Every structure is written in C-alpha cells, then in structure tokens.
Regions:
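Iron-sulfur cluster-binding electron-transfer modules in prokaryotic oxidoreductases
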Residues: 2-209
Length: 209
C-alpha cells in the first residue's frame, strides 16, 4: 500500500519521471493508441504478441509497459453519445473501460460497459451524460501506484478541474464505472492537489456505479 508507493517513489529516476509526466500530458493520444493496439492485437496469435510485448518491456521499462495476458478482451467501442439536457448524473467512464471492451468469449450481442451504463440510466429514468472531451482524463492511479509524482499531480489536477467544470461546480453527481478509479478519486487524488483545487474537489459528489 502506502509503503510500497513510497518505495517506488524513491526508486523512480529522473528519466522515468520525465517519461511518466509526458505520458500523463498526452493521455488522450495514449488512450487512442492503446485502444487501436488492443483491436489489432486481437488479430494476432497470442504467442508472437506476448514475445513482442516482453521484448518491448525489456527495452523500455517493465513499470511503464504491461504484460500481455491471454486471451485479450476486445477493444472498446466508441463511447455512446449522450445529451447533457435532462441528465441526472455525470458519467465518467474509467480509461480502462475506454480502452478495453467486451471480454473474450462474450456473446456477440453483448455491449461494452459504458453502453450498458447509459442504457441502464435511460431505462430507469435516470439518464447519464458523458462529456464529449472525456478522453485524456484519468484518476491518476497508473502514476501514483508507481511513484511518479509529477505525472500523478498533473492528472489529479486535470481531472478535478474537469469534473468540477463538467458537473457544473458539483451540481451533478458523478458516477464512475471502476472501483479502483473511484477509490483513486476519493482517497489518492486529494493528496496531489493544491489548496485551491482541494476546495474544488470537496464540492464533487463521486460514487461508484
């Protein structure tokens, strides 16, 4: 937990910290490339894909590049369009659910989690709204868990300011579709904020789907 994060923070060198910050600043592009990569990877046999990923991890960094489990889930579909008017909640799809879609082996007529949440809201008479510019925002866990302070501070500040703006200064409740993301927003993000941004964060009503 906290001890491991501190150890990782102490072990993060300047080069890795710089790469992590650059990744945080370009997260929308990273999302797009990752999603395209998952879609492409589903067309490649698992063994060659795993070998290539491991080689890349050895060259770049095992901390920044994940292993390739198998079988891979599908790449996420485009987020559903939702109107702001009449919405009862702001829906923030976690970046993991903006990259990965249906699990391997899912029924052909099944839908991605974001579409399921939107449809559930519609049927229950509690429609949700997904901002058009949600790409590029993240709870910061990929950086905080590895001890990359600058990248974490950048994303924590960005998401709090965006959520505050999207929710009309806290008027709309915010629902999140990944427990780890909700936890990060509620427990970890405040540690990386300035006093002014902590005030914005305190006005947000964040809850797990």
């Amino acid at each position: 937990g906290a001890v491991m994060k501190q150890l990782r923070k102490q072990g993060a060198g300047p080069k890795a910290e710089k790469v992590a910050l650059s990744t945080a600043q370009r997260w929308a592009l990273v999302e797009k490339l990752a999603r395209a990569g998952v879609i492409s990877a589903n067309k490649i046999p698992h063994k060659p894909l795993e070998l290539g990923a491991n080689m890349a991890r050895n060259v770049i960094s095992p901390d920044l590049l994940p292993t390739v489990p198998g079988p891979l889930p599908k790449g996420a579909s485009r987020l559903p369009e939702t109107p702001r008017e009449g919405a009862q909640a702001l829906y923030f799809p976690a970046c993991i659910n903006r990259i990965f879609g249906r699990p391997a082996g899912a029924a052909p007529d099944s839908v991605d989690l974001p579409r399921a949440v939107v449809e559930l809201g519609r049927r229950s008479g509690q429609p949700v709204w997904i901002p058009d510019d949600v790409a590029g925002d993240c709870c910061g866990t990929p950086w905080s868990s590895k001890g990359y302070t600058e990248g974490f501070e950048y994303q924590a500040t960005k998401i709090v300011r965006d959520l505050w703006h999207w929710s009309e200064h806290g008027k709309l409740p915010i629902i999140v579709d990944a427990a780890s993301c909700t936890h990060g927003l509620l427990d970890s993000v405040p540690e990386a904020l300035s006093e002014a941004d902590k005030e914005l964060w305190s006005q947000l009503r964040i809850m797990d789907v």
